[in-house]
């Protein structure tokens, strides 16, 4: 995390509670020029998925070259494999449009199905790779693009790479394989012995190994062919047959797969003992997953997602993904998640594998979780004058990163430079909006936002209630005005809700913003702490933001009534240690502006003397970044 982040969001929003004194209907396309030139693309696209078993009706994959013109148009030339055409690769070409915002958020018209859109992000230069997924339609997919230059030679591939893969053999969800291996290339067409670790759904989903010797690679026409031995029965081995691979211009990334198959392979240049501290800042992510829930009855659970994570340089990260489950609409998930500890990391379900430079990582599922996630480091930004960091419009409670949408009534923190001439906090309610605070105003889709705190590097504000889907707005554009000087504009997605639980800094400040114990009170208004834990059967008060519209409505920045309670319009669920809690109240905290409160009963049977996840779920959001002392 960049050093300008500070733990003031909770103190300025909850001051006193704990004794602490125009429509934006089009995505920002201002950075289209950042996506320009020749890219190698691998995409696996699954459609016609059965809503009960997740059986795949049609599988398609493409591999080849996509050329972006820097002005919002692309062409693709390569090969497509389609189960509707016998699963034999055929020449394929397509064209379409794309947009890239100032923060790297991208939307690309699908080259496989022009009615679908790939959502994702463009990474930092060196290389500016793209990761994306079509989460808003009925299909599930993963899209990876890396910049490629002149024709690759055998000498271009030298050194050690992690490679991760996911393979829907014959386009069948019940025959999915995944795994990872290390490649050591000599620059002359030879690999050292390879050990593949992975699992096969059709072989019992038990983690297994495959040893390969004498594997070679050859370069021709810009493509590197990895000559894995072809097994007589490919369904019984993790890896089989030749793979067509591309290498990025900086030689650090690989992407490809089988032209006649439905696999995706991503490789990252690596080394032993990669420092955890290298993993800082924002990473754009995309993934495709199939969880085997009952193979004997044909049940699979396929989902795809795009998102981002904010790596804290301490081995942990705040993670958001826009996840499209089979049989349901996409929703937004935020969690805190451990990433790396000096190299690869296994959390019991996923194996995470880092690149040597911190520019990328891959994550592979194990056993019955068949998954491939790719993370690409986003660009770091700086500016002069009044400047919003394009990656730093964050939920003020969870610090969920830039792909997380904003919701009406949500407390948001904006980070940057020159945002204010001095530090100021609102002293009364309603919070100032058009009148400004310390000479500062903030516009959200042209509306003045109520301000609770301003400083040269951070502003805390309330998103006006008319913002988002309730106002037929898919995007929200933020702009700061400091003493009549306007900042750059930054555009993000919106949703009905974007829950974020406020957390407390404790243990001498060891918890970074967005991670730690939840801000929860007992009935006597004392804090829930390790020495004063929650108990089964008691009613607790949880404080959060991003729960959206309320009834009766409250004016922007005004205090919620202390006599007529404003309850949230969305259905809310609270999960404590895996058990659903009964909710007595969910709405605005009486007497406060923009602060939401949930009163819930701690379920019986929770583990004592520990910490458990406290999860808040809405119809379109899922927040699991905070924990509860029990």
Name each region found by the language model.
Residues 47-54, 170-174, 178, 286, ...:
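A sequence-level detector for low-complexity, Ser/Thr- and acidic-rich stretches
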Residues 1-12:
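Bacterial N-terminal signal peptides that target proteins for export
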Residues 11-14, 360:
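N-terminal start and proteolytic maturation junction detector
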Residues 23-387:
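Mature soluble binding/inhibitory domains
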Residues 6, 123-124, 248, 355, ...:
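Short linear Ser/Thr-Pro motifs
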Residues 15-24:
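C-terminal segment of classical bacterial N-terminal signal peptides
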């Amino acid at each position: 995390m960049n050093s300008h982040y500070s733990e003031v969001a909770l103190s300025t929003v909850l001051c006193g509670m704990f004794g602490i004194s125009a429509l934006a209907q089009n995505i920002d396309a201002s950075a289209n020029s950042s996506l320009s030139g020749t890219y190698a693309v691998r995409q696996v696209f699954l459609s016609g998925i059965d809503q009960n078993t997740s059986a795949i009706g049609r599988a398609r994959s493409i591999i080849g070259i996509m050329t972006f013109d820097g002005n919002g148009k692309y062409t693709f030339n390569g090969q497509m494999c389609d189960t509707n055409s016998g699963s034999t690769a055929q020449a394929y070409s397509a064209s379409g449009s794309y947009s890239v915002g100032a923060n790297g958020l991208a939307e690309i018209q699908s080259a496989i199905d022009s009615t679908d859109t790939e959502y994702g992000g463009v990474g930092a230069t060196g290389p500016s790779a793209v990761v994306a997924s079509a989460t808003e339609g009925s299909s599930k997919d993963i899209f990876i693009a890396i910049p490629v230059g002149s024709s690759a030679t055998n000498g271009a591939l030298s050194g050690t790479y992690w490679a991760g893969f996911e393979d829907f053999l014959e386009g069948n969800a019940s025959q999915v394989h995944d795994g990872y291996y290390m490649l050591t290339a000599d620059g002359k067409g030879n690999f050292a012995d390879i050990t593949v670790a992975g699992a096969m759904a059709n072989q019992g989903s038990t983690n297994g190994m495959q040893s390969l010797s004498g594997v070679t690679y050859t370069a021709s026409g810009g493509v590197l062919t990895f000559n894995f031995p072809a097994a007589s029965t490919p369904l019984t081995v993790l890896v089989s047959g030749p793979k067509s691979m591309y290498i990025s211009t900086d030689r650090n990334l690989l992407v490809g797969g089988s032209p006649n198959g439905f696999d995706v392979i991503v490789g990252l240049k690596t080394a032993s003992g990669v420092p955890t501290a290298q993993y800082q800042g924002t990473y754009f992510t995309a993934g495709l997953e199939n969880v085997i829930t009952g193979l004997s009855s044909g049940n699979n659970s396929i989902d795809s997602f795009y998102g981002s994570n904010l790596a804290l340089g301490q081995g942990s990260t705040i993670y958001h993904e826009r996840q499209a489950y089979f049989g349901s609409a996409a929703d937004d998930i935020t969690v805190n998640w451990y990433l790396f500890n000096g190299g690869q990391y296994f959390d019991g379900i996923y194996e995470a594998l880092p690149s040597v430079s911190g520019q990328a990582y891959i994550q592979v599922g194990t056993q019955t979780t068949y998954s491939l996630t790719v993370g690409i480091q986003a660009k770091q930004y700086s500016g002069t004058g009044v400047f919003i960091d394009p990656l730093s419009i964050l939920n003020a409670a969870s610090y969920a990163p830039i792909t997380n949408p904003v919701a009406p009534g949500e407390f948001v923190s904006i980070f940057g430079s020159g945002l204010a001439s001095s530090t100021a906090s609102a002293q009364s309610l309603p919070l100032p909006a058009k009148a400004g605070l310390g000479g500062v105003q903030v516009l959200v889709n042209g509306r003045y936002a109520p301000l609770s705190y301003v400083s040269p590097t951070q502003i805390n504000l309330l998103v006006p209630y008319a913002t988002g889907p309730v106002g037929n707005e898919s995007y929200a554009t933020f702009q700061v005005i400091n003493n009549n000087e306007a900042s750059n504009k930054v555009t993000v997605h919106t949703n009905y809700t974007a829950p974020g639980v406020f957390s407390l800094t404790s243990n001498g400040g060891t918890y970074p913003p967005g991670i730690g114990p939840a801000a929860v009170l007992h009935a006597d208004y004392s804090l829930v702490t390790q020495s004063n834990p929650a108990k089964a059967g008691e009613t607790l008060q949880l404080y959060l933001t991003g729960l959206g519209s309320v009834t009766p409505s409250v004016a922007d920045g005004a205090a919620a009534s202390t006599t007529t309670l404003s309850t949230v319009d969305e259905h809310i669920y609270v999960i404590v240690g895996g058990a659903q809690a009964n909710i007595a109240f969910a709405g605005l905290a009486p007497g406060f502006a923009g602060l939401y409160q949930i009163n819930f009963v701690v379920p019986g049977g929770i583990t004592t003397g520990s910490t458990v996840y406290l999860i808040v779920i809405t119809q379109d959001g899922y927040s699991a970044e905070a924990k509860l002392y029990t």
